[in-house]
Amino acid sequence: MHLGWWKDEVEPFAAQWETLSRAAGAKKTAFLLGDFNSEADVRGEGYDLVLCSGWQDTYRLAQQRDEGYTVMQAIDGWRDAPDAAAKKRIDQIWCSQAIAVKSTRVVFDGLQEPQVSDHAGVLIEL
């Protein structure tokens, strides 16, 4: 999935999240994953909204984890941000309930696997 930015005037994150979480929330165990366009370390925006909605960040649940950054440099859509060159964890895997997660790691970041996009992927092992 690919969500909009928190302050997007046309398709704001909060409205997209409300629709998405309502559709996925009826499932016993559901996973939502992809580009959330919401930095995990920025408070009061998309990441916190998802967390406060009762969803679990599998990165935080994992027994083993790497740094988790899926964006390593300035990319389209973020180039004008004051911290454009900073590493970001905007691609996430969320679960509708707390589960046991053995590990999480970034993949296709150009280090262990070829880079295939301006974002790296995320892989979890349950």
Locate the predicted segments by residue.
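Active-site regions of metal-assisted phosphoester/phosphodiester hydrolases
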Residues: 1-126
